């Protein structure tokens, strides 16, 4: 509505009264009048009135005019209010936390999220990668049975998906490189700043590649370039994280073994003892990345720490550790935002892996058949959008969910609840 008013005013329709609705943003009280900014989702409008209405919903009737010379206002216009009516009061927000979405910060975060997803999609289109929409209800687990949300699917056991990767692999023979932006679910009852039961998962699968061709770096850097080149999203980033700089390329590559050595040399322990090959170094690696101060590509993790579908590297003579063609991207003060790998493309190797992991191959018959009928060397990765957004905006959040009569706003941020 506000943007439409500006268009009408540009046609030189003067001395008309308009009725506008919107939400009151922070106001600036003066001696006799109060200036406030009204937002309706399409834009901002300066309003002149009296009263205490910050973050309330109001109906305003008044005359639109250009701001006086020497003064400024959003859009260069203001409305002199003749009549106003309070629709809702802000005082209820303390008890109804799902209303924290009302405000400039929440608006900026959601707008930046939309711009981020658009930038990712633009980057994939540039690289001739096609978007597909895999199912959210599945019967095959990807990451492990302990983190599955189970449900009854017309008398059969089904799950909310942990990842769309297996389905993306089935699209390669008919579409080539593919990606999806899909919700993923993890039944991990961890109440931390870095755990979400539901999150937006950007995943890609690429055919006829080797380990060096997994284009995580290109997607991250090119998407950030798109955001910073667009005036609207650049303004949002400046508002939320003024000192953000594009990530320096190339990212720092560091093997799992070298990272283990680095941790021991810098006194970062594993449960009070030094790290050894085979330990899960996830939390310690985040500390390491914070100290190094740049984006780090960790690669070649032991097979016992990674998923069944990841391609195994040739085992070195005399070593009892099998490594995978896998990688994680870690960002300082954020943590892991991307995990990727080459996939097992050999039928016999995949069957052997099922047995080693104690998995029932019959459940994955459709996935296994991809290796029997026209497979290729392929790999891919998954990126958590909420985690990625924290690196661009310091803040990221999910919409509220209702559970047992208690409303929770699910957040992913190091800064506590939005205010």
Where are these regions (language model features)?
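Class II aminoacyl-tRNA synthetase catalytic cores and aaRS-like
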Residues: 1-419
């Amino acid at each position: 509505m506000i943007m439409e008013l500006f268009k009408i005013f540009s046609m030189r329709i003067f001395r008309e009264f308009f009725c506008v609705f919107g939400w009151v943003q922070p106001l600036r009280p003066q001696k006799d009048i109060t200036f406030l900014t009204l937002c309706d989702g399409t834009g901002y409008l300066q309003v002149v009135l009296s009263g205490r209405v910050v973050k309330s919903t109001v109906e305003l009737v008044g005359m639109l005019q250009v701001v006086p010379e020497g003064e400024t206002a959003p859009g260069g216009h203001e409305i002199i209010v003749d009549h106003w009516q309070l629709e809702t009061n802000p005082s209820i927000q303390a008890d109804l936390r799902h209303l924290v979405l009302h405000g400039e910060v929440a608006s900026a975060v959601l707008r930046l999220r939309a711009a981020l997803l658009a930038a990712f999609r633009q980057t994939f289109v540039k690289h001739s990668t096609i978007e597909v929409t895999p199912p959210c209800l599945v019967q095959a687990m990807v990451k492990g049975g302990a983190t599955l949300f189970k449900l009854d699917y017309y008398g059969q056991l089904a799950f909310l998906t942990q990842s769309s990767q297996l389905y993306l692999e089935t699209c390669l023979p008919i579409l080539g490189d593919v990606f999806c932006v899909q919700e993923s679910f993890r039944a991990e009852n961890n109440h931390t700043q870095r755990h979400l039961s539901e999150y937006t998962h950007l995943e890609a699968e690429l055919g006829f590649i080797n380990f060096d061709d997994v284009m995580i770096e290109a997607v991250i850097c090119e998407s950030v370039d798109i955001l910073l080149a667009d005036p609207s999203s650049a303004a949002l980033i400046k508002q939320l994280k003024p000192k953000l700089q594009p990530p320096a390329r190339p990212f720092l590559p560091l093997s799992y073994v070298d990272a283990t050595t680095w941790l021991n040399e810098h006194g970062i322990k594993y449960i009070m003892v030094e790290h050894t090959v085979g330990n899960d170094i996830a939390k310690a690696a985040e500390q390491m990345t914070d100290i190094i101060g740049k984006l780090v590509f960790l690669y070649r993790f032991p097979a016992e720490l990674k998923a069944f579908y990841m391609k195994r590297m040739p085992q070195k003579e005399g070593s009892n550790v099998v490594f995978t063609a896998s990688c994680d991207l870690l960002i300082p003060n954020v943590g892991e935002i991307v995990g990727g790998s080459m996939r097992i493309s050999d039928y016999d190797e995949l069957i052997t892996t099922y047995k080693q992991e104690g998995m029932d191959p019959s459940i994955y018959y459709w996935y296994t058949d991809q290796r029997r009928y026209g497979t290729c060397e392929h790999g891919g990765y998954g990126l958590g959008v909420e985690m990625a957004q924290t690196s661009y905006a310091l803040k990221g959040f999910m919409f509220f969910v209702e559970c047992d009569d208690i409303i929770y706003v699910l957040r992913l941020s190091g800064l506590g609840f939005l205010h």
